[in-house]
Amino acid sequence: MTIQMSYSLAAALVSALLAPLALQAGTPQSIEVVSFGAPRERLLQLGACPGCDLRGQSLQGEHLIGVDLRDADLRGVDLREANLEGADLSGARLDRADLRGARLSNADLTDTDLRRADLRDAVVINAYAPNVRTDGMRFAGADLTGSHLIYGGGPD
């Protein structure tokens, strides 16, 4: 038996074993798209909901570490005691949001609207916050260490 013949025999054997596993050409394949429904559900399932409208929702005590909420509408959202460490909140609207006791360390707050938000007792260490809007923000007892958060709100 020659080497050429042995190679051909081995190739034929491998081909015969794998043939049942091959897809037939032209067989349509479908991909099922699963919707996560409401924006709140999408945020909790995927950890991202950029541009979502979450106005008035309750996310109290949720673990939202590193979530993507860029340009989200979070006006009036209850985020008391929520963990938003490392979250991307750039461009988000958080006016009148309740962030009492929330953890926002290392969050991106670029261009975020925090007007009239309640950040009392929140931890906002080393958050990146250029162009943040803070008129009327409440921050008594908040730890703003290293955040360069230029606030305009009063102490209560």
Task: Set out the residue ranges of the language-model regions.
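Tandem repeat scaffolds
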Residues: G26-D156
